A protein has these predicted regions:
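C-terminal segment of N-terminal export signals and the immediately downstream linker at the start
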Residues: 31-57
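Cyclophilin-type peptidyl-prolyl cis-trans isomerase
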Residues: 139-173
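N-terminal secretory signal peptides and thylakoid transit peptides that target proteins
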Residues: 2-23
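Gram-negative bacterial Sec-dependent N-terminal signal peptides
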Residues: 17-36
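Conserved alpha-helical segments that form or flank metal/cofactor-binding pockets of metalloenzymes
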Residues: 78-92, 106-139
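An amphipathic alpha-helical core segment
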Residues: 159-214, 220-231
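Alpha-helical scaffold segments that form or flank carboxylate-/histidine-based iron centers
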Residues: 59-73, 96-119, 186-189, 193-201
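Early transmembrane hairpin module of multi-pass membrane proteins
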Residues: 56, 62-87, 91
Length: 240
């Protein structure tokens, strides 16, 4: 074969390979992350994109903290969950369903811990918003009915997040028609107690240590006063 013919054949093979790969990618895109068709492997859990840029929470949370917290810790929980559920029936489920099905099972503790931490972090990033805001409408009415005032709610959140011993979370939750502040240790999630999370504050040290060192109370106050996403909380209220 002449060199020219050889080059043409090589180019044809390259074109066919490109079309094949493109077709596979298109097919995978059509399946999506919400489900899988018969004979197609279950989609893996993904790290959701942040709802803002990595420096958007400054000066209260630095870009460096977000890079480590989101890009290292949060990602690791997602990847470990995928590793642990691969090839099991759990691989077909959402994070929320995985949490509910593994809660309280000692033999599935590793799956629960990683799945819950992945879910908790998804929720935490959405619980924050550059510039924060104020509770309004139905949420404000429920806060006043449950706590007396927004300031009383903020004080309870501050106390819960600051006094949580060791790693964990502070939450604003709905319990039926009433709102409550609860705290959970390690990876625990209020959903397994039948509560509806509205907002979350991460008090694991990786959430604040680069910026605040051991001053957890300062970190918590900065979030409550400047970054809490009250619109997100309102959207999470149980529907009547």
């Amino acid at each position: 074969m002449h060199v020219r013919d050889h080059n043409l054949a090589f180019k044809r093979r390259g074109l066919l390979l490109t079309l094949l790969v493109g077709g596979l990618a298109l097919g995978m895109s059509a399946v999506g992350l919400s489900g899988c068709s018969q004979g197609v492997a279950a989609p893996s859990l993904q790290l959701p994109p942040l709802p803002y840029s990595q420096n958007a929470l400054e000066p209260y949370i630095s870009q460096k903290t977000v890079e480590f917290h989101y890009g290292k810790h949060h990602l690791a929980y997602v990847e470990k969950t995928n590793e642990l559920i691969k090839g099991t029936n759990l691989a077909q489920l959402s994070l929320g369903e995985i949490i509910k099905q593994t809660a309280g099972s000692p033999d599935k503790a590793a799956i629960f811990n990683n799945a819950a931490q992945a879910w908790n972090h998804n929720f935490y990033w959405q619980s924050l918003k550059p510039g924060g805001g104020k509770p309004e409408g139905e949420l404000l009415t429920k806060i006043q009915a449950s706590f007396g005032s927004v300031e009383n709610l903020k004080k309870q959140l501050q106390d819960a997040a600051t006094t949580q011993f060791g790693s964990g979370w502070a939450w604003l939750v709905a319990d039926g028609d009433k709102l409550k502040v609860v705290k959970t240790g390690n990876a625990e999630n209020p959903m397994v107690q039948g509560l509806t999370p509205l907002l979350a504050i991460d008090v694991w040290e990786h959430a604040y240590y680069l910026d605040y060192q051991n001053r957890r109370a300062d970190y918590v106050k900065a979030l409550i006063d400047n970054l809490l996403n009250w619109e997100f909380a309102a959207a999470n209220l149980p529907k009547a």
